[in-house]
Amino acid sequence: MTIWVDADACPNVIKEILYRAAERMQLPLILVANQSLRVPPSRFIRTLRVAAGFDVADNEIVRQCEPGDLVITADIPLASEVLAKGAAALNPRGERYSEATIRERLTMRDFMDTLRASGIQTGGPDALSPRDRQHFAAELDKWWLEAKRKKESM
C-alpha cells in the first residue's frame, strides 16, 4: 500500500495531514510534482519530480500506482484512471471517488464549461475549510483501516 499525491495542486494543509499520517501508518507517501518540494525528513516520505508538461505527473501516478494504493487528487480524469487500475482515490476535501461520483463531477464540469462559454461568471471552488480538513483526515483513516483489514484477511 502506497499513498500517491498529485502534489502540484494539493493544498499544503492537506500535505501536512499526509506527512503525519505516513509516519503514524508507516506507509510510503510519494508526492509527484513537476517542481521541487520540501518535505519533512522521513523514511516513509519521498518526492518524485517529473518534467513539466500537461498531465506528466498524472501519467506517472497512473503508471506506478497499484491495486490497493491510494491516490490524493482533485483531478477527475486521474481519479477515473487509478480507479480502473484498482487503486482508491480521494480528493483534498475528503470525498472518496467512485464511478458514480466521477460521472457526476464530469457532468457538473461540462455544465460549468458551457456556462463559462456563454459568458456567465462562475467563480472557483470555496477555500478549504477546517471541516474539509477534518473530513479529509477522517476519510484517510477510514481508507487505511479498510486496506489494513483487507490485507490481514488475505
From Swiss-Prot:
Q: Name it.
A: UPF0178 protein YaiI
| Cystine connections | none
Would you say which domain of life the source belongs to? Bacteria
Matching entries from PANTHER family are given as: UPF0178 PROTEIN YAII
* InterPro entries membership: UPF0178 (IPR003791)
Signal sequence range: none
Which family is annotated?
Answer: Belongs to the UPF0178 family.
